[in-house]
Amino acid sequence: MSGGGPSGGGPGGSGRARTSSFAEPGGGGGGGGGGPGGSASGPGGTGGGKASVGAMGGGVGASSSGGGPSGSGGGGSGGPGAGTSFPPPGVKLGRDSGKVTTVVATLGQGPERSQEVAYTDIKVIGNGSFGVVYQARLAETRELVAIKKVLQDKRFKNRELQIMRKLDHCNIVRLRYFFYSSGEKKDELYLNLVLEYVPETVYRVARHFTKAKLIIPIIYVKVYMYQLFRSLAYIHSQGVCHRDIKPQNLLVDPDTAVLKLCDFGSAKQLVRGEPNVSYICSRYYRAPELIFGATDYTSSIDVWSAGCVLAELLLGQPIFPGDSGVDQLVEIIKVLGTPTREQIREMNPNYTEFKFPQIKAHPWTKVFKSRTPPEAIALCSSLLEYTPSSRLSPLEACAHSFFDELRSLGTQLPNNRPLPPLFNFSPGELSIQPSLNAILIPPHLRSPSGPATLTSSSQALTETQTGQDWQAPDATPTLTNSS
C-alpha cells in the first residue's frame, strides 16, 4: 500500500470524498512511505525526514516523520565493541541463514554490564534514512529480537538509547541489549539496539479489517487505545514526550492483544522553558500547535496524536488526511471549526493577528458512523482539542467511561482469550494522578483498605508482569540538544 494522503479526504459527512482504506501518512520531510515493507510514493509532508521504524515487529512502515537524527542528544562518544561490523562480512541475510553472530553487548536496563550475545537467522525487515532493522534469533533462548542499526555521531550520546535505557513498562517495547559496530567507511560507528520482537502493528491489524471491508471490533479499539494511553501516562511521568505517535509505531501481539509503544527516535525529555523543534511528528497525527510552529509545546501533542489514532480506528481511515502542512490545518478546521483567537494564542501567540476563514465546527456525531458508541465519540472530542491544556491527560483517558467494559469482570477478547494485563499498576503509576485510582482499579481488584490500592495478589501481578522500578523524572536531564 503506497503512502501519502488520500485524494480529497474530509471526514465523513463534511463534503469531500474520502478513500476507504487506511492510508499511510506522508509524514515529514520526505515522501510518505508504503505500508509495512512498502516503498515510498506519497507526497512530502512537514517534518525532519526521519523514517519511522514502524516497527520492530512484522514489518516496517517507511513513512517519514519529523525529528532530528536519532543520534542527537547530549555530549559523549560511542561505546564499546566498535571494532566489529554487524552483520559481519559474508553473512547471508536470508530467511534460512544459520550463521551465528556473536557480539559483546551491554544490557539494556540497569547498570552497564557487558556480555557476549549470539544471534542467528539474521534478516532485514525494514530500512529508512535512520538505518536498517534486522530480525534475529537469540542463539541461547531461541527468542526473536529486532535489531535497529543507526549511524552514531561520535560527538553525541544517542538520545533514543538514553531514553530507552530508562523506560521499563509492560506497554513499551523493551531494550534487551545494545552494542556498537563499525561500518564500511573509516571511523564509521553504528549503534545497534536489540529490542524485543512483537509481530504486528496496529496499522497492519487495522488494514487487515479494512481490506476485508470490516470494522475493527470495538473491544480491540478499547484494548489497544487503553494500553496506548497507559504507556503515554508512564513516559510523560518520566518527562519524556514520544513525538511520533501513529498506528505504525504501536506494536501488537494479535493473539494476546498486548500493545507496546515503539520507535523512540523522535522522543525527547521536554524541559519547561527550553525550545523544541516544531518540525516533528508524522503529518496526519500532528497537533495543531506544531502546525502553528510552536516551540514551547508540551507532552499533550502525544495526546492529540493518540486522539487521531482512536478516530482512525473508529472511521477506518485517517480523520485529518492533509496533503501538506497547510492542508493538514484545513482538514482539522473542517472538523473542529476555526479556532478562536484565544485558542490560537494558546497554540502560538504569534498567529493571533492572522486572518482565518470562519468555518463552523462539524458535529462529532456526523463525523463518525451512526453505530459508533457515544462514549467513543465523547472521548475523541476530549482529546482533539485546540487548546493543549484542555486535552485529557493520558490517565484521565484511561479512566474514561469508554473503557469501562475493560474493568468489568469476565470481559474477554473475541478469540475467548483473557484480556491482556491492564491493571498491573506499579506504585509509580498509581502516584501520577491518585484521584483517578478509584476508577482505574476495577472493584474486583481493590483491597479492603480502600479503592486507591491494589489487592496483594494484584500487587504481585504488578511485580511479576512489569518488573518496573519507577522513579520520578530527572530534574536535570543530561540531554542538551535543543531539537
Swiss-Prot record:
Post-translational modification Phosphoserine, affected residues: S2, S21, S72, S77, S97
UniProt PTM comment: Phosphorylated by AKT1 at Ser-21: upon insulin-mediated signaling, the activated PKB/AKT1 protein kinase phosphorylates and deactivates GSK3A, resulting in the dephosphorylation and activation of GYS1. Activated by phosphorylation at Tyr-279.
Record-listed N-acetylserine modification sites: S2
Keyword Thylakoid: no
InterPro entries, A to Z: GSK-3, Kinase-like_dom_sf, Prot_kinase_dom, Protein_kinase_ATP_BS, Ser/Thr_kinase_AS, STKc_GSK3
Function field: Constitutively active protein kinase that acts as a negative regulator in the hormonal control of glucose homeostasis, Wnt signaling and regulation of transcription factors and microtubules, by phosphorylating and inactivating glycogen synthase (GYS1 or GYS2), CTNNB1/beta-catenin, APC and AXIN1. Requires primed phosphorylation of the majority of its substrates. Contributes to insulin regulation of glycogen synthesis by phosphorylating and inhibiting GYS1 activity and hence glycogen synthesis. Regulates glycogen metabolism in liver, but not in muscle.
Designated name of the protein: Glycogen synthase kinase-3 alpha
Species of the source: Rattus norvegicus (Rat)
